[in-house]
Amino acid sequence: MRSWGQGAGKVYEIYRFPETASDTDYMVRFSTATIEVAESDFTLYPDYLRHHRTIKGACEFDVNVSGTHRVIDNSGSVFDFFGDTPVKCKLTTPSAFATNLIHRPQVRVKDRVLKLANLSMNVDELFTLPLVPNSDAQRLLNIVYVIEGELKLDSQQCTLIQGDTLIVNDQKLTLDTPKCTISTNMAQIYHAVIALPQAPWTAHAVPWPRP
């Protein structure tokens, strides 16, 4: 955990790939962040794209690209932008909580928020979120973050509570997904799918077209 934006809030990095990568050469990073001051400037991430989802609260973003336009962000909405784009965040609620996927342009990401109640299912049933068509990815990462409530992993005899995260890598599964059952009485979860390019891959920046 560390502060961001000169005390604008706290950021919690949960996962990066590769796990041994430095702050400038990872392919993708997943984190959560609080937004706690009325107005702040987002941290810049040159050579990356940002996929920002507001989970709780609401903000207004001033985005400076060839002039200024404004994006209103309500709870649950998704906001994608270039990591080197100046973005000013203005709270429209007392505070906000968000998830961030910061990734190289050749990495594809997709996410959603689900409310689960009184269910039991195999983990592989959960991991059905469609990705970008015709993706060249050969490696998928699934991230499940518990926003509220709890999830029980029956075959693992463990329980995930608020703030816990499950990472499943399709090349080296940490769970036997076809046999691993999750169950819950009530939970709200964040689920992301990350499609990584075919190996050999490079973590160095690649050019992308500007709008």
Please annotate each region the language model reported.
Residues M1-P211:
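Jelly-roll (double-stranded beta-helix
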